[in-house]
């Protein structure tokens, strides 16, 4: 099992009058290679669930196991390492850094991973080529269409 979530809760302002239960007992299992759609009405907890699955947040209660690793008790630094090595997803707004070129936006995670400059150059251009953006590697997000920005984010 790649992702295994059991009885997951995310409660904001727990025990207070303003308490919000964003997730209330979610159980979910996803196998490697499986495609899953998270659907629901506005305010139903989709983004909260995705933030937890993407290791951007941790649950209030319940268990989250990602590729055999218990996520609940990890430090912020450990979660950042897991995000960098184990999981990724594309945000609706692409989250490209406006001041950086397509090349630099793709290169940035590789820098954080400690990939050598020689390997980075090859991997960045290969990735941009795979999504048809190798000819626009010098362009900043404002100089790209939404679809082009999405391909750079991928």
Residues covered by each model-derived region:
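ABC family nucleotide-binding domain
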Residues: 1-154
């Amino acid at each position: 099992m790649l992702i295994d979530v059991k009885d997951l809760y995310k409660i904001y302002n727990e025990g207070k009058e303003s308490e919000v239960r964003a997730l209330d007992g979610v159980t979910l299992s996803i196998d490697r290679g499986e495609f899953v759609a998270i659907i629901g009405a506005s305010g139903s907890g989709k983004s909260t669930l995705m933030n937890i699955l993407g290791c951007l947040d941790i649950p209030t209660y319940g268990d989250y196991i990602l590729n055999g690793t218990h996520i609940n008790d990890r430090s912020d630094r450990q979660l950042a390492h897991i995000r960098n090595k184990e999981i990724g997803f594309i945000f609706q707004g692409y989250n490209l850094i406006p001041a950086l070129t397509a090349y630099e936006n793709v290169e940035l995670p590789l820098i954080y991973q400690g990939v050598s400059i020689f390997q980075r150059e090859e991997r960045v251009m290969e990735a941009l080529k795979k999504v048809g953006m190798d000819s626009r590697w010098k362009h900043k997000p404002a100089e790209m269409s939404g679809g082009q920005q999405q391909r750079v984010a991928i």
